[in-house]
Amino acid sequence: MALSDLLELTLLLLLPLLERLSAEDCPCSEASLCRPIRHHRDFEVFVFDVGQKTWKSYDWSQITTVAVFGKYDSELMCYAHSKGARVVLKGDVALKDIINPTFRASWIAQKVALAKAQHMDGINIDIEQEVDCSSPEYEALTALVRETTEGFHREIEGSQVTFDVAWSPKGIDKRCYNYTGIADACDFLFVMSYDEQSQIWSECIAAANAPYNQTLTGYGDYLRMGISPRKLVMGIPWYGYDYICLNLSKDDVCAIAKVPFRGAPCSDAAGHQVPYRVIMKQVNSSVSGSQWNQDQQAPYYNYKDPTGRLHQVWYDNPRSISLKAAFVKHYGLRGIGMWNANCLDYSDDALAREQTEEMWGALRPRL
């Protein structure tokens, strides 16, 4: 059986089931909470949620969209709708498949049906795969975004279709995308202004996850392409990177192992990601305490592990995030968001509660 025939058969079997699910009683306390959110707020606060129940402690006074990257939770959907916030699907697909228009149509129809069945408000397309500029995938990706937007907007009133892009449009991680075409084709781009050391072309040393000037250079590149600032939402990291130092100089320069990535000799793969809640528990007992790098406008600290090895941890905190939030406001970007909201400590501990409130508060742009 050909791939297109198999897809059509799967769709024929799946759609009636999803339609029946959608028609079932609303899981919310009020039927109105199962209706899609139709209004659009002036300032977007876009939240990625990866599961569990920490969402109950989020700052819902700010949130406009929750992208569900964990298991679907109808309770989350009901609560978000009660606060006027959208809840959107994750959209991921192998790029080699989307060259086929029949496959694209089937994939989109399934996603629309799933969103309807789960009373959701759209989709966040997260495809972080390599694309060659001269490949058929280059045009197919833009077509997928355009057709997905058309399908969702037609079938779900007020729905939102967004696309995740790297911190810069300049071929990061070998992703040659039609950025202007994709921006035109969807509601807005979520710019992942983090993992900016995924390809290290200079010295193999530890550095900030999202250095201030480098981050802003990426937005300048997008804006110079003619993409409207109203089509850009700044993504900031609520996690950092922990690197083992092969050598730590007196100036706190941490030499790291050479781990190549997509052509670059070194990368942040030499380290590992650490959520902010873990960082806050470790920083005060570290060798150095929290330090501030003026060039990168980011905090870091050094610590020794039980075997005596020195580590350097780079992260973002309310100070570094506030600087970026001010840029969002000054240049009229669509909004701000983070990967991911689960990274904070939502326990009843008084200090943790204060730290968590400060991180949410840093999202509010100040000049």
Swiss-Prot record:
Q: Which residues are glycosylated?
A: N178, N213, N247, N284
Major place of localization?
Answer: other
Q: Could you tell me the keywords of this UniProt record? A: Glycoprotein, Glycosidase, Hydrolase, Lysosome, Signal
The coiled-coil segments of this chain are none
Family matches, as InterPro entries: Chitinase_II/V-like_cat, Chitinase_insertion_sf, DIAC_cat, GH18_Domain-Containing, Glyco_hydro18_cat, Glyco_hydro_18_chit_AS, Glycoside_hydrolase_SF
The residue range of the signal peptide is 1-23
**Domain GH18: start-end pairs:** 24-367
One CC-aspect GO term: lysosome
Record bears the keyword rRNA processing: no
Q: What is its EC number?
A: 3.2.1.-
Q: List GO BP terms, alphabetically.
A: chitin catabolic process; oligosaccharide catabolic process
Kindly list the places in or outside the cell where this protein is found, as annotated in its UniProt entry: Lysosome
> What Gene Ontology molecular-function terms does this entry list?
chitin binding; chitinase activity; hydrolase activity, acting on glycosyl bonds
Q: Main EC class of this protein?
A: hydrolase
Q: Catalytic positions?
A: E128
Q: Which family does it belong to?
A: Belongs to the glycosyl hydrolase 18 family.
**Function, as annotated:** Involved in the degradation of asparagine-linked glycoproteins. Hydrolyze of N-acetyl-beta-D-glucosamine (1-4)N-acetylglucosamine chitobiose core from the reducing end of the bond, it requires prior cleavage by glycosylasparaginase.
The identity of this protein, by name, is Di-N-acetylchitobiase
UniProt source species: Rattus norvegicus (Rat)
